[in-house]
Amino acid sequence: MMSQDAGEPFFAGKNKWGYDYMSPYMLIKDLGKVKTLAIGRYKARFGMGLVMNNSFSMGKQASLASIGRVSRGLYAHASRQEGNYMQGIGATVETIHNLDVTGFLSYRKIDATINSDDNSISTILKTGYHRSATEMLRRRNASQAIMGGNVYYHVNGFHFGITGYQTSFDKPLHPDTTKLYKLIAPWGKRFWNIGADYAYMSRRISINGEVATGNSKGIATINSINYMVNSNLTLVAIQRFYSYKYYSLMASSFSEGRSVQNESGVYLGAKWQPIYQLTFSHYFDWAYFPWPKYLATATTRTFDMQHSATWSKNTWSITARYRLKTWNKDSKDDNDNKFLDRITQHRIRLTITKDNKLLFLRTQGDISLYHKDENSFGYMVMQQVGIRKNKMQAYTSLAYFNTDDYNSRVYTYERSTLYNLSFPALYGEGIRFAATIRADFSSNLMAIAKVGGTHRIDNNKIGSGLQAIDTKTPIDVDLQLRWKF
């Protein structure tokens, strides 16, 4: 995997090998007792992610179906994401029947902003941008080492696991504690975390949980149950408590605040199919943040709910979805005094899809309404077409969007290269287009090419600051070649 962001030097400066980012790896599976061997750049996920997960985390909609059934172990890092991966070697071995042991070692350079007074790390950067002289100075100017492992026992639908790791930096982490929300950020040079996870799965029920701690002495725990009442009704409940004192630099799990820290919450979901052609999905999520967050100088709360209905017959389906979300954010009164304001966001989506072996068609409409002091409104209409024949697949999409500002932005999903999710955020007025072609030459050789672009009607410039592009229609290109042997 090779990646180049707009504005980054190509075969110039520090990029003497051309691309700013490359991700070499080798992944071997099922080699005798060795279930997985990862060399180069790889990812790891164990338990429910409270200790170690630099792979992905479930969204709230996906939790209705996937809770308790997420994958675990070591994976190749084959995405364009430049911040979340390990570099070195990792292996999973079946030592005895039903007992797997995983060990991993990693050392890599990281991007960081450095405090000039004591040469410590103020912030670890994960954007991967190296476009200006300042950003180049922050490129790989610190290092991180990780050593850890996992023990996993499984039998008759039950499993129990223990995960632990230690990480260290060549420079200590000293975040800017003059900012209230950073008072609970990790501080120091060496950190460790350990956790235990459990699960029981049967045909109708899955129960999962994990509890973790670390050198901060804070506690994090998450517990879930997915119960299939009958063939037509499934219920999901997730409880989470992440102390504001807890942190793990390698964690990622189910959360509202995008962090396994400073959050308590309850999620309730249901999936109901009263008749064969009709399915209803619902979830409600309440979250509480005891410590001030970014852009919120006091305790805050969030409420999020979504309702959707899908009607399907043969190769046709129609889905209607409504989502309501409210949360707190700092505002200022006429005297410049801060207070917590309440923000409300509504999102509506309607899709009509035809999907068979040869043809894929989808028409989609989106509406977004954001309210703080005043309303911000946006909408989008989109058409996708896909053709699948023999070993070739081709997909195109065309969308027109019009929003008042970034707050009422809309999202569209585009098929892209493997391991790379593409959900561009669209705002202002314009047209988004994309085309993707995939060719499977054999069971071992596959190639994907994607071209996408956004034509802005309301502006001659895309983005702002260092990300500003003086064109109405920037183009992005993705190429991927995979050879398995």
List PLM regions with ranges:
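Acidic/polar N-terminal loop/beta-strand segments that form early-domain functional surfaces
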Residues: 3-5, 40-42, 452
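Outer-membrane beta-barrel proteins
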Residues: 3-21, 75-82, 137-140, 212-214, ...
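A conserved hydrophobic secondary-structure block that centers on an alpha-helix together
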Residues: 7-9, 19, 26-29, 124-128
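A short acidic (Asp/Glu
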Residues: 10-12, 49-52, 219-222, 374
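A subset of solvent-exposed loop/turn segments in beta-rich extracellular surface proteins, enriched
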Residues: 16-17, 48, 52-80, 109-138, ...
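Outer membrane beta-barrel
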Residues: 17-111, 229-248, 392-406
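Exposed, low-structure sequence patches enriched in small/polar residues
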Residues: 21-25, 84, 140-177, 183-485
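Aromatic- and glycine-enriched pocket-lining scaffold segments that form the walls
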Residues: 83-132, 140-142, 146-150
